[in-house]
A protein has these predicted regions:
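Classical Sec-dependent N-terminal signal peptides that target proteins to the secretory pathway
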Residues: 9-16
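C-terminal motif of bacterial Sec signal peptides marking the signal peptidase cleavage site
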Residues: 18-21
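Bacterial N-terminal signal peptides that target proteins for export
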Residues: 1-8
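Lipid interaction determinants
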Residues: 23-157
Length: 157
């Protein structure tokens, strides 16, 4: 009887670790499909592999630039599409992500409702180059290119 109890106890602990072992950060739909993400800034010098962004430097610090960036939003949908707003226009496209390596990709061309220039063009180019993601559904989303020495950061609007 004691052996049977031990067996079920061990089985329960093992199954619990599998069921509760899913990390919220790895749930791509919970992260991406969690509402409207607003662009905060672009950063350089941060350590992508850690959560310590003490050395990350923002690309823009002037109030006018930050206001322009804040007009850029993106909404990821669980059907693999996204839509968003630019400063004076909108855009749409397709995306995919893989939680096993936190890879991210824009699939095909991003279609914009306006001729791209300035910060709008900069954002679309950086979005097209994004290859990795990290974040959570409550606080922030970061997208980085292959080198992961720069990233763009979003927060919920």
């Amino acid at each position: 009887m004691k052996t049977l109890k031990y067996f079920f106890y061990t089985l329960f602990i093992t199954l619990s670790s599998f069921l509760y072992g899913c990390n919220q950060e790895d749930d791509i739909y919970e992260i991406f499909d969690s509402g409207v993400w607003q662009l905060v800034n672009y950063y350089t010098g941060g350590d992508w592999e850690s959560n310590n962004d003490r050395y990350a430097r923002p690309a823009y610090t002037e109030a006018q630039d930050l206001e322009s960036l804040s007009k850029i939003t993106i909404t990821f949908k669980n059907d693999g599409t996204f839509t968003g707003t630019l400063d004076g226009g909108t855009f749409e496209g397709k995306w995919q992500a893989d939680p096993s390596d936190r890879s991210f990709a824009v699939i095909g061309e991003i279609k914009a409702s306006i001729k791209l220039s300035g910060k709008n063009a900069e954002f679309i180019k950086k979005l097209e180059l994004a290859s990795y993601y990290k974040g959570d559904s409550k606080r922030l989303l970061q997208l980085a290119p292959d080198a992961r020495t720069t990233y763009m950061q979003f927060t919920h609007k």
